[in-house]
């Protein structure tokens, strides 16, 4: 049951899959979480370690679960050409963030909320070494 005044919105299929993965995290030390290694298999990199950056691997894996072809790349910024740019984010849309001047550095996840002051909430992989919902500016 929804609380009074709570918005009811349809959750895109890919976002429902992503929500189900919240809490998946890296194994400290020499071990590797098999689920994160599985995410990597959705990319051409096919990494076998949870120490390899995996935000794009997670996004590709999520899309694959619902029959949508992602970028196939482990590079976060590969998603910049996968979809069309939006002037305002839509619940569940892909968010790509640049990091520094390195053209390969970035982060990708799924938009879940705006908080004001240019802050957004993103559900993504490899956020503090886990699948989480985190705040970004």
Please provide the spans of the model-predicted regions.
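N-terminal capping segments
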Residues: 1-66
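...with weaker cross-activation on analogous glycine-rich loops/strands in unrelated enzymes
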Residues: 7-11, 64, 68-132
């Amino acid at each position: 049951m929804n609380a009074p005044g709570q918005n009811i919105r349809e959750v895109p299929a890919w976002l429902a899959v992503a929500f189900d993965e919240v809490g998946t995290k890296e194994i400290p030390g020499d071990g590797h979480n098999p689920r994160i290694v599985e995410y990597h298999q959705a990319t051409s990199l096919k990494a076998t370690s949870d120490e390899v950056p995996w935000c794009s691997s997670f996004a590709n894996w999520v899309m694959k679960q619902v029959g949508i072809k992602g970028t196939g790349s482990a590079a976060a910024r590969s998603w910049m050409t996968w979809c069309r740019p939006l002037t305002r984010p839509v619940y569940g849309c892909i968010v790509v963030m640049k990091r520094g001047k390195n053209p390969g550095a970035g982060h990708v996840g799924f938009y879940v909320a705006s908080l004001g002051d240019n802050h957004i909430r993103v559900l993504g992989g490899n956020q503090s070494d886990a699948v989480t919902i985190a705040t970004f500016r």
